[in-house]
Amino acid sequence: MKDRMNKFKEKVVLITGAGKGSGRLLAQAFAEHGSLVAANDISPINVEEVVRQIIAKGGRAKAYVEDIAKKVGVQQIINQVEDDFGRIDILINHAAVEPHVPLLDMDEWDWHRVLDVNLTGAFLMTQSVGRLMRVQGSGVIINLITESIADKNWGAAFIASMSGLEGLTHQAARELAPHGIQVYSVKNLSETVAERVFALLDLQMEER
């Protein structure tokens, strides 16, 4: 624990979908390790509650309420985080919508909204943060991916978005590596997600 505190102290960590689920767990975990947490969510109630909890425990965090499915919202987040903290060391793409709607019952709006948030949002965040990290010469981007195919309750749009996010992760890793930016995917299981993320980052830091 102490070794990790030294590794992650003062690191600026931007987490999308930080208001609930794995995003909330990771925001709290990074704050406990001394990181500066930039917590994004579309719900001001959820994300501001997370930030209050972190600050109450002596951590440092700030809420950023924007819709990451829209480019203007993404750019607002990046600009504000850069103004507040000066850089972004780690980006975690967690924001996702998860409608359990059968293919034959899903309307076009739901289809587009799922892909816009789960896939396009991750693309926009990766692109915008990646440009900042390129200037910095380093950074880590982690995409949390649900292994949706194994769960028959997920809808077609969600499964398509997770498959697309896996492909985006692989290609982003190839393109961004020359700029000192590492891109990974981590299985999104709330019980173990924090340990998986920290184990990955521990290994990544040892290899540098």
Write out the residue ranges for each language-model feature.
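Conserved Rossmann-fold SDR core element
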Residues: 30, 87, 141, 166, ...
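Canonical Rossmann dinucleotide-binding motif of NAD(H)/NADP(H)-dependent dehydrogenases/reductases
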Residues: 8-37
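The beta1-alpha1 cofactor-binding region of Rossmann-like NAD(H)/NADP(H)-dependent oxidoreductases
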Residues: 44-45, 65-77, 108
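Catalytic loop of short-chain dehydrogenase/reductase
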Residues: 142-164, 169-170, 174-177
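A short, exposed helix-loop element centered on a Lys and neighboring polar residues
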Residues: 126-127, 170
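Active-site loop of short-chain dehydrogenase/reductase
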Residues: 11, 59-60, 87-88, 133-146, ...
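Substrate-binding pocket helix/loop in short-chain dehydrogenase/reductase
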Residues: 102-103, 110-115
